[in-house]
Amino acid sequence: MKKAGILNRHLAGALAELGHGHGVLVCDAGMPIPVGPRVVDLAFRAGVPSFAEVLDGLLDELVVEGATAAREVREANPGATALLQTRFPALELVPHEELKSLSANARLIVRTGEARPYANVLLRCGVFF
C-alpha cells in the first residue's frame, strides 16, 4: 500500500500520465465539466475536499510552469485570490467564459467539493529537468 502522497488511485494514475504542456483544471463543485477531458471527481459534499487542500496536494506532485484563473475571482472570492496569488505569482487572469473554453482542452479535470465561487485554476505542466 502506498504510504504518502495522493492515495486516490484514479487521481494518482491520471497524474502519472501527464506530460509537459498538458493542462490540469482544478475546479470547484459548480464549474461546468466539458465533454472530453479525463475527470477525477473528488467532491464528497459541499466544501469537502476544499479547493486549497486539493490544489496543495497536486502541487506536491506536479511541476507547474503556468496557471490561469478567472479574473472574476478577485472580487467574488478573496480567499481563493490570495491562495492563487501566493502559489502562482505570475498567475494569468482571463474572463471566466474563456477559462471554461480553455478547460475543454485540459488533459485532466479534478473536481473538488469547493462551494465558494470561481475557485478554479488551469495548471500547465512543466518538466522537472
Swiss-Prot record:
Pathway, per record: Carbohydrate metabolism; D-ribose degradation; D-ribose 5-phosphate from beta-D-ribopyranose: step 1/2
Binding site for substrate: 28, 96, 118-120
Protein EC: 5.4.99.62
Enzyme active site: 20 (proton donor)
This protein's UniProt keywords: Carbohydrate metabolism, Cytoplasm, Isomerase
GO molecular function: D-ribose pyranase activity; intramolecular lyase activity; monosaccharide binding
Keyword Chloroplast: no
GO CC, any one term: cytosol
Biological process annotations from GO: D-ribose catabolic process
Compartment annotation: Cytoplasm
Annotated catalysed reactions: beta-D-ribopyranose = beta-D-ribofuranose
Broadest EC class assigned to this enzyme: isomerase
Location (main, coarse): cytoplasm
Entry keyword annotation includes Isomerase: yes
Sequence similarity: Belongs to the RbsD / FucU family. RbsD subfamily.
Subunit structure as annotated in this protein's UniProt entry: Homodecamer.
Biological role: Catalyzes the interconversion of beta-pyran and beta-furan forms of D-ribose.
Name of the protein in its database record: D-ribose pyranase
Organism: Streptomyces avermitilis (strain ATCC 31267 / DSM 46492 / JCM 5070 / NBRC 14893 / NCIMB 12804 / NRRL 8165 / MA-4680)
Lineage, highest ranks first: Bacteria, Bacillati, Actinomycetota, Actinomycetes, Kitasatosporales
Gene designation per UniProt: rbsD
